[in-house]
């Protein structure tokens, strides 16, 4: 195309079309979307950069608040994690408080306070201390509801700023966790807890805690924190302006600023003491709050850190030596060591004098923690311990770590010292190896608890681990010490096949093996699912340590050991011990061995007679074992207990009589064991002491004036004699005892079935034992014999009560088995306790009359093992002649023996005039039995009665041995009211507090009754009845029969010449030289002088030395008092008075003249009418003045002689 041509329209259209397309794309939606995306991406990038910058700034800010314990610079991740933990803690606490506000404690338990009341409370507390302010913040919002005005001055902040801020914002970041932990709403006490009783039990008071609170107004002072002591309380605040709003739970805090203890006001030097606790790895566990003003550290600053890092580098090595000594003296009291230098918060060092102790884990036997008690010796250079630290400690982490490892490995060693822990009474390091053999408490789990329960230690294994119980004496001591919780169960068991072998087991092992009542506490412990506490472990450890440390000296005689201990080496030794034990038992008792066929199996007799059960507790059966202290010997008589639980329970089953009598042969009476020579040699010193005291009692006669005064009180004599005589008897007969016993009350309602007597050759029917049931006595739990099983101890000697032969009277039948006493078949044999054989029926009458002042036929157990008041008589080791004569076929005594007995009876009747002249009953050794060891087969039952109880024979037969007559019979009653005898006016009744005894049918009935009410006595030819603690019984009478009743109910004796005698636990029959009776009844039957002359005509007139002079030498033995001639005695007294006359003060001549002017009778040398009285002062009636003066004169003459 040529140059000059104009463009064509085709080209211009194409260009315009291209421009239209571009403009269309620019205004299209897609274009706008792309443009928007580009712009948004650019803004997001800018936002990210901005957020990143802000985040970096926040992280840098959080790093400033990071806890100062970290020495290294915190990273961004650490700061974010710390911030996250803080956020979670705040959220958890706020949610917890909201939950409690809805479902927590009732709102009524917390008092409501208004803002005005809070201001009043704040002013009251802050006015006393200028460094204290009160702040109240809400649990829901965390903002301060109220703050006292002093807070602005103390914190150096404006009050408006404080009122609008959160309380947590004022705290240092490192103390927030402590603040939240101590302000949990569930733990806070109520502000008015002194008025809310329930609050004391629902919410325990919280200990004060320490926090640092920031002061200043700008950020430049944000690191200036001061320590404060905070005490939180719970209150509810309501707003009166907005009553529709509910009350708001709030925390009221009393905030007190802490100052350095070395600045004014300074803490006294003697009170700068604090305590710390650290682990074997030297890490602080607990720090006393007293350490805050002394060290400058808050408790949370030290807890969890090493104690070595605060010590001077040169003193760190001392901690190794200190912990070595801690290991050496583990469990002992605290010990002191070298002083150490401790760094305070400001960087200065203080010198501490420390004492150290430790606590030992009783399970692992390792030291759990160490307790240090520190006293500040020197103060730091900078007294402000809270000042900012300028100096830096030379921390060598490597050295500290090495020392910690060394000390930790040192304290890993177990402690073997058997002493208690020095950390109070929480635990002990005693001998717990086998008791807590489960390694350590950290390994305990559910499975481990089951194993511990299955492997529960028994008392046998504990004794085996202790390994200190070597002989029977120690075993007996342990039994006696623990008899309150474990009743000792001992007894004698004879095997049917073995025949006579005694097996010994301790009551501990026996009761733990069976299901007796004493194993209930052990079973409860085994069933307990909870692990024992420190207190329980310490208690058990104390018991074990006491058993280990207690050493009992060896006893004099070799005795067998417990079969559960390791003292016996083989079975042969055990058998030998058993055989020796049985031999020594029989030898020491001097009694014939009962044949094996007659011995009761399993501790009881064969039940053939029926009747009421006679129950004896298993604890009572153990009284036979132990060391006899009745005599003055150390003989050990141990009776083995039953082997199995069944045997132990058999002792408590009803016992009945063995109807087959046990025949005794003369070959069985062998003299082994304690003979006369052995006793005399062994008790020579005791004899001499007794004789000396006996002579002193006779010569001094301290009872003469007392008895003289008592004799004048006619109506009151019957009440006082029982008590006073018993005291005299107790002092005379028991003053040589080695142990004092507390008198226990006797069961007042103890009773038993009736016993009767009948013809000597009657039939045996309807056996009724004379022992009450256990339920009738309130003291069944104590080891006592039934009251009916023996005569009380205050009668000079004891015999058990036995059922009597059957008797048949008109209209009524009485039956009792004529066998041996049922109680003695199963009782354990002890020294002085002799089992009676089954005596033939014809001799039971004679056998029953043996008691009262004569030595006992069967003395019971030793008083040291019998707590009952009626078991205090002294045991005898020799067999009584009355027992041996019971087997005699001859009934008539030789004439020579009869005459000799008459002379002895006369002396013994006279000897009752003084409570100390009865040598037989007063001697604790009973030496008169040593002269009669061999039985005399020629003696008759009547002769045996005279041998054993001459006093009773004298009362029955009179002075010349003939039958009693109306002139010579009387009723001797001690401890019971007067007894009436209206049918005969001349019958005498010597009564002392005994109830009336009626004898309307015959005037010559005589009765010796001690503590027994009247007793009915129908007629029967020949019988003798012993009734002790029984219901009203009716016994036939005989002209020569004696009815012995002790503590029995009223009885009447309508027969002819029956007599009754009884003994009481409160008194004994002692007839003094000047006192014999008093007013007998309300009607006043007889005077005391007439009774004295009729009943004992030769006693009252003769002085005591004359009685002793007439005593046969055979009976008196070593108790002879030197003769005293009356003229010589009076002459010596006059000489003594003449020699004393010169030493007496005398009036001078002038004094005599002066007195003569005032008193005319001095000048005339006469006696005035006021003092010229012929009657006795103690007499009540003027009519009896002459007789009383004569009686008093006789008494004075007797005393002077």
Curated annotation (Swiss-Prot):
Chain segments carrying region CSNK1E binding domain: 555-760
Location(s) in or outside the cell: Cytoplasm; Nucleus
SUPFAM superfamilies: PYP-like sensor domain (PAS domain)
Polar residues bias spans: 721-731, 957-976, 983-994, 1001-1012, 1035-1050
Sample GO molecular function, one term: ubiquitin protein ligase binding
Cited Pfam families: bHLH_PER, PAS_3, Per3-like_PAS-A, Period_C
Annotated spans, CRY binding domain: 1123-1201
Database matches in InterPro entries: PAS, PAS-like_dom_sf, PAS_fold_3, Per1-3_PAS-A, Period_circadian-like_C, Period_circadian_regulator
Region (Disordered): 1-50, 717-788, 881-923, 952-1067
PROSITE patterns reported in the protein's UniProt record: PAS (PS50112)
Domain (PAC) ranges: 337-380
Motif (Nuclear export signal 2): 925-932
Biased composition (Basic residues): 733-743
Biased composition (Low complexity): 767-783, 881-890, 1053-1067
One cellular-component annotation, GO: nucleus
Disease listed for this protein: Advanced sleep phase syndrome, familial, 3: An autosomal dominant disorder characterized by very early sleep onset and offset. Individuals are 'morning larks' with a 4 hours advance of the sleep, temperature and melatonin rhythms.
SUBUNIT field: Homodimer. Component of the circadian core oscillator, which includes the CRY proteins, CLOCK or NPAS2, BMAL1 or BMAL2, CSNK1D and/or CSNK1E, TIMELESS and the PER proteins. Interacts directly with PER1, PER2, CRY1, CRY2, and TIMELESS; interaction with CRY1 and CRY2 is weak and not rhythmic. Interacts with FBXW11 and BTRC.
Official protein name in the record: Period circadian protein homolog 3
The organism of origin for this protein: Homo sapiens (Human)
Gene transcribed to yield this protein: PER3
